């Protein structure tokens, strides 16, 4: 099958699905190997970025999705329903960061790291579809394990969790020292 026809079929699949589609599913549907399909999609991504188009293809973990470019927001908002913007407070961002870096993680483990109850924060993050239940821990009570979602990757503009910034060891030491000082201050009061 020629490249142009494969590109057209990939484009049709991504457009029709409207959500991220695993590269393996695309390859299987087109009866081609995964590496060839991935290479074709990456070439398409480059072309979409270079052209004056309103859409692009993004990569999320091992999946691809067709979506609109951020620059098209002004035109789209005039015709489409504008979804309610979610406000990520410092508490939500802190909890989300812990989940993103430590997943899969239980609510109790999050609370242990934060030092305060995290029910509200985790529930809000689930409501915003940034985190979800990814399983249960094999421990008494079988606590729920949480992890990030594709919406998390999409909203933060990263392709996979490996793209999360690495926290420098000296920063970790600084944060640890600050936390210990804060705990000591609370004990002294």
UniProtKB/Swiss-Prot annotation:
Its main location: cytoplasm. It is found in: Cytoplasm. GO terms for biological process: cell division; chromosome separation; DNA replication. Keywords: Cell cycle, Cell division, Chromosome partition, Cytoplasm. InterPro entries: ScpB_csome_segregation, WH-like_DNA-bd_sf, WH_DNA-bd_sf. GO terms for cellular component: cytoplasm. Pfam families: SMC_ScpB (PF04079). Belongs to the ScpB family. Homodimer. Homodimerization may be required to stabilize the binding of ScpA to the Smc head domains. Component of a cohesin-like complex composed of ScpA, ScpB and the Smc homodimer, in which ScpA and ScpB bind to the head domain of Smc. The presence of the three proteins is required for the association of the complex with DNA. Participates in chromosomal partition during cell division. May act via the formation of a condensin-like complex containing Smc and ScpA that pull DNA away from mid-cell into both cell halves. This is Segregation and condensation protein B.
């Amino acid at each position: 099958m020629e490249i142009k026809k494969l590109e057209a079929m990939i484009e049709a699949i991504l457009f029709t699905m409207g959500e991220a589609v695993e590269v393996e599913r695309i390859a299987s549907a087109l009866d081609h190997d995964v590496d060839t399909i991935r290479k074709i999609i990456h070439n398409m991504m480059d072309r979409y970025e270079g052209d004056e188009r309103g859409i692009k293809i993004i990569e999320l973990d091992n999946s691809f999705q067709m979506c609109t470019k951020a620059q098209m927001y002004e035109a789209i908002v005039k015709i489409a329903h504008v979804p309610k913007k979610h406000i990520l407070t410092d508490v939500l961002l802190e909890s989300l960061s812990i989940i993103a870096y430590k997943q899969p993680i239980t609510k109790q483990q999050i609370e242990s790291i934060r030092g305060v109850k995290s029910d509200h924060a985790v529930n809000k993050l689930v409501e915003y579809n940034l985190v979800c239940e990814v399983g249960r821990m094999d421990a008494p009570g079988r606590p729920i394990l949480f992890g990030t979602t594709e919406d998390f990757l999409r909203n933060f503009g990263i392709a996979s969790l490996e793209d999360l910034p690495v926290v420098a060891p000296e920063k970790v030491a600084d944060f640890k020292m600050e936390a210990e000082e804060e705990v000591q201050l609370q004990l002294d009061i």
